[in-house]
């Protein structure tokens, strides 16, 4: 499936690692094609097959990859996680350019 990424809104992110933790829970690491700035506590929005969902970022802002914990939610409630579960290292997803969320760690 070819998807045109809207400039200024989305970018591609490549799956660089995937670690299955349980039957329905895994970690995945994404390498965005552009620098992705975020604060601890924010989330990113990723997509595949025209479906988008928000996921809390588990990695540090100092890392060059985005680490996510994903729980499989089967259809009909889960539309994106079954697609993400089928991804292999090297596959790409869309990612919104900006992190969101106001529940961030405040400096002391």
Where are these regions (language model features)?
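Short secondary-structure boundary segments
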Residues: 1, 7, 97-99, 107
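Short, Lys/Arg- and Gly-enriched loop/turn segments at beta-strand edges
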Residues: 51-58, 100-108
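Helix-loop module immediately N-terminal to the HCX5R catalytic loop
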Residues: 89-102
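Ferredoxin-reductase
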Residues: 2-91
């Amino acid at each position: 499936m070819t998807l045109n990424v809207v400039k200024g809104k989305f970018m591609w992110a490549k799956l660089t690692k995937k670690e299955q933790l349980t039957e329905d829970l895994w970690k995945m690491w994404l390498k965005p094609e552009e620098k992705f700035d975020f604060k601890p506590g924010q989330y990113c929005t990723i997509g595949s097959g025209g479906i988008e969902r928000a996921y809390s970022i588990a990695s540090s802002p100092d890392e060059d990859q985005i680490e996510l914990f994903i729980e499989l939610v089967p259809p009909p409630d889960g539309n994106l996680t079954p697609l993400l579960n089928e991804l292999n290292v090297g596959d790409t997803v869309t990612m919104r350019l900006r992190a969101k969320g106001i529940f961030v760690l405040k400096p002391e």
